[in-house]
Every structure is written in structure tokens, then in C-alpha cells.
Amino acid sequence: MPTINQLIRKGRKAKVKKSDSPALNKGYNSFKKVQTDLSSPQKRGVCTRVGTMTPKKPNSALRKYARVRLSNQIEVTAYIPGIGHNLQEHSVVLIRGGRVKDLPGVRYHIVRGALDTAGVQDRMQGRSKYGTKRPKDKK
């Protein structure tokens, strides 16, 4: 516990918060070939690998993921949400932040319904999260 005098002399240091999605906090200047501090909510990238991985201990499944090379030249692993997808190597995708709790090292999500990624088929509820259009009413 510091004394009042020590606090007057030094003061308290603010804690630096580390980003949950560091690849979104970097930009890239392709003319100068240098990284910049330009953060953005989403980034575009190209799939370099699409596959499945198994989750951590109590869970069991085959979770779909894609390895994505972003427009700022950083390569990240992103989760593909929803049932079924049309992604393959060289597909152009949009990624957002947000980790997957039971997949170690996966800190990003692919946005469904944007760029080359199709929305989830036959989805009725929570459509906006999966890029699904409103179904036509049957009369």
C-alpha cells in the first residue's frame, strides 16, 4: 500500500488492456509495404485452407474453420458459423472479432452472407446472424 507522498510523487499507472482480436487493429500500406495502426471492425481476407477441428475436452464435434490471409497480410484462423458452407480455398471472406470458447487459437468469426460466403439455407430464426434472406410468404 503506497503512502500519500508516494502517490503524489509517482501516481498510479493505468492498466493497458490487451485486444481480443489483434489482427483487426493493424492496417497495411501496400505502396510503402509497411504495417499501420488502422483498426477496423471487420477485415477482408482470402481463405488459404478450409477444414474441421475437434473442440476441447467436455465437447465433441467437428467444427468448421478457415485459415484466412487478411488484407493486412496477417494470417488468422476463423470459425465458420451455421450449418453447411460454400467456402473453399481462394474464397474471399469478411471476418469479425469474437472467439470460439472450445476451439483454442480461434479468435475470429467469418461473416455469413458477405462477399463469397453464402447465408445459411432454410434458416427461420436468428437469420441476421447467418446472412439468410427473409423467406417468401406462402399464400
UniProtKB/Swiss-Prot annotation:
One Gene Ontology term, aspect cellular component: small ribosomal subunit
Annotated region described as Disordered, given as residue ranges: 1-55
Molecular-function GO terms, alphabetical: rRNA binding; structural constituent of ribosome; tRNA binding
Polar residues composition-biased segments: 32-42
GO BP, one annotated term: translation
Annotated CDD domains: Ribosomal_S12
InterPro entries linked: NA-bd_OB-fold, Ribosomal_uS12, Ribosomal_uS12_bac
Top-level taxon of origin: Bacteria
Keywords attached to this entry: Ribonucleoprotein, Ribosomal protein, RNA-binding, rRNA-binding, tRNA-binding
Matches recorded under Gene3D superfamilies: Nucleic acid-binding proteins (2.40.50.140)
Family note: Belongs to the universal ribosomal protein uS12 family.
HAMAP family: Ribosomal_uS12_B
Quaternary data: Part of the 30S ribosomal subunit. Contacts proteins S8 and S17. May interact with IF1 in the 30S initiation complex.
The protein's role, per its UniProt record: With S4 and S5 plays an important role in translational accuracy.
Name used for this protein in its record: Small ribosomal subunit protein uS12
Organism: Halalkalibacterium halodurans (strain ATCC BAA-125 / DSM 18197 / FERM 7344 / JCM 9153 / C-125) (Bacillus halodurans)
Annotated gene: rpsL
